[in-house]
């Protein structure tokens, strides 16, 4: 396999401008913005070739990709001065799927990867906003449950709606930090039940 992971950050990009076939649309656009000097957070794109290999190889991720991904996360940690899994200053990342052509609403995303029962406390302390931190963690569980584990979003949404009914509120933003704690526990139970 040739080069499979392409880095981008505010120092530029390792990829070619018109490389949607290799990077997908989002990856190519991020690379182009980085090359133009626009402020983009540090990140990397895993080549579309890896997806092709994944499906040809009985849904196995090559060890080389796992090693390179860990290396790229280390680069992001160095640039951001955050560390994946750190209890004081955790690195949070988003994982976004992409294709050669735009497919709005069809591609999956997982936000807040890096949050867990411990790192959510660091996010709360960093932002001074427990409700935001817990809601972010709840979203991670929901997205991961749906995208990776195949649990229908409906089940998560139903838990939220039922919880709001018991609290007598209409909007998600009316829920307090303790409410999100309760929903996080409910979401974890749902994941256990469905997997």
Predicted regions span which residues?
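Nucleotide/phosphate-binding sheet-loop regions of phosphoryl- and nucleotidyl-transfer enzymes
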Residues: 1-195
């Amino acid at each position: 396999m040739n080069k499979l992971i392409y880095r981008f950050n505010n120092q530029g990009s390792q990829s070619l401008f018109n490389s949607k076939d290799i990077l997908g649309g989002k990856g190519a656009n991020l690379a182009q913005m980085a090359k133009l000097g626009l402020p983009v957070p540090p990140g990397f794109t895993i080549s579309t070739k890896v997806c092709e290999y994944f499906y040809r190889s009985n849904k196995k991720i090559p060890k080389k990709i796992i090693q390179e991904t860990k290396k790229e996360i280390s680069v992001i940690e160095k640039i951001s001065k955050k560390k994946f899994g750190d209890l004081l200053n955790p690195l949070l990342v988003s994982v976004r799927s992409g294709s050669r052509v735009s497919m709005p609403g069809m591609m999956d995303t997982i936000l807040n990867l890096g949050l867990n029962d411990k790192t959510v406390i660091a996010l709360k302390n960093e932002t001074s906003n427990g409700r935001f931190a817990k809601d972010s963690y709840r979203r991670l569980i929901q997205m991961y449950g749906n995208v990776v584990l195949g649990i229908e979003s409906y089940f998560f949404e139903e838990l939220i709606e039922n919880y709001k009914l018991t609290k007598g509120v209409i909007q998600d933003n009316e829920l307090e930090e303790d409410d999100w704690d309760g929903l996080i526990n409910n979401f974890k139970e749902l994941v256990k039940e469905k997997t």
